[in-house]
Each structure stands twice: as structure tokens, then as C-alpha cells.
Regions:
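Aromatic pocket-lining residues of Rossmann-like dinucleotide-binding sites
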Residues: 23
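NAD(P)H-binding glycine-rich loop region in Rossmannoid oxidoreductase-like domains
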Residues: 58-69, 74-94
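N-terminal Rossmann-fold NAD(P) dinucleotide-binding loop
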Residues: 16-17
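Rossmann-like NAD(P)(H) cofactor-binding subdomain of soluble oxidoreductases
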Residues: 89-155
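Mobile gating loops/cap/lid regions near enzyme active sites that modulate substrate access
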Residues: 156-178
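Glycine-rich Rossmann-fold phosphate-binding loop(s) that bind the pyrophosphate
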Residues: 12-13
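Conserved N-terminal Rossmann-fold NAD(P) cofactor-binding segment
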Residues: 31, 37-72
């Protein structure tokens, strides 16, 4: 694996593009590759994000790509999956999204990926398990976003109640996300 900091982001929806925007602004990535089943959307997102490159803290390359880009990636972030529909249980969503995770993971691994997976697709705990099982990677190389969002919400609510900055609230949510 090369020493450059390369992230492949699979899923160009709201969560994926929020992640991409954060990576652009934080400057920790040298190359960001976007993959999505909707190729036209991915190209459009690449163009939009690239417009912000002059304001990025470091030199960075953004491109729409395919799974062959995973070979030399340090991290593959998976945000792809269907959203939960009204009346649909998380277990029903898990069945649908597990199929998507399996296909994505097989495509990533078929291209020689040996880095770290970060999973942000719901239900995240189950999707992380699917990726770990399908990839055959050590479980230490498959990280689910877990309760990070729940923790942020908890800290925000406590801060609002106490009328302080959420930066000054140190609390953590434990358990399953959702």
C-alpha cells in the first residue's frame, strides 16, 4: 500500500457527501474517490466538491471512480444502502442492506483492498458484521460508526439544557445505534 492518504467512499448520498465535504475541509486526505451505482450523480458530486478545492487546507484530488481504486486505498468508507421506509422495521432494512453490503464488500475485496473499512450504513452494527464476515478481514479492520451520532445528539441536548457549548459536554452513548 502506498504511503499517500487515499480514501474510497462508496455511496454518494447525503451521508456520503457530508463525509466527503468533511474530508475536503479537514485536509487529512490526499485522494478521495467517489463510487456510487448512479455514475452521473457521482460525476456531478465530484465536480461540485472539486469547486471547493481552492479553499481546502491541503492539496487534494477528488474523482469519481470504480472499485479498481480500492487496491491502494488506506480506507474504504461505506455509506451506501437504502433508507428505512415508513413502517419498515430495522430488521427488514437489515435484510435489504445486507445484500448491498455483501455486493460492495465483494467488489472491494476483489480489487486487492487491504486497508480499513469504516461503515456508516444502517443498521450499522449488523452491516459492520456483514462486511467483516464477507471480507474475511480481521475485525479490528472493520469499524462501524456505532453510536457516534447518538453521542453527538446526547451532547447537544445536554448542552442545550445546561445552556453551555456542546464542546464542554463530555458524555457517551453506549449500546446499539438506532
Amino acid at each position: 500500500m502506498e504511503s499517500k492518504r487515499k480514501v474510497v467512499l462508496v455511496g454518494a448520498g447525503f451521508v456520503g457527501m457530508s463525509m466527503a465535504y468533511s474530508l475536503l475541509n479537514q485536509g487529512g486526505v490526499e485522494e478521495l474517490v467517489l463510487i456510487d451505482v448512479n455514475k452521473d450523480k457521482t460525476i456531478g458530486e465530484e465536480m461540485d466538491l472539486s469547486d471547493g478545492l481552492p479553499y481546502a487546507p491541503h492539496k487534494m484530488k477528488i474523482k469519481a471512480g470504480d472499485y479498481s481504486e480500492c487496491k491502494d486505498a488506506n480506507i474504504v468508507v461505506i455509506t451506501a444502502g437504502l433508507a428505512q421506509k415508513p413502517g419498515q422495521t430495522r430488521l427488514e432494512l437489515a435484510v435489504v442492506n445486507a445484500k448491498i453490503m455483501k455486493e460492495i464488500t465483494q467488489n472491494v475485496m476483489a480489487n486487492g483492498f487491504s486497508g480499513v473499512f469504516i461503515i456508516a450504513s444502517n443498521p450499522v452494527d449488523l452491516m459492520s458484521y456483514v462486511v467483516a464476515e464477507v471480507s474475511g478481514m480481521p475485525k479490528s479492520k472493520v469499524i462501524g460508526s456505532g453510536t457516534v451520532l447518538d453521542t453527538a445528539r446526547l451532547r447537544y441536548l445536554i448542552a442545550e439544557y445546561l445552556q453551555v457549548s456542546s464542546k464542554n459536554v463530555h458524555a457517551y452513548m453506549l449500546g446499539e445505534h438506532g
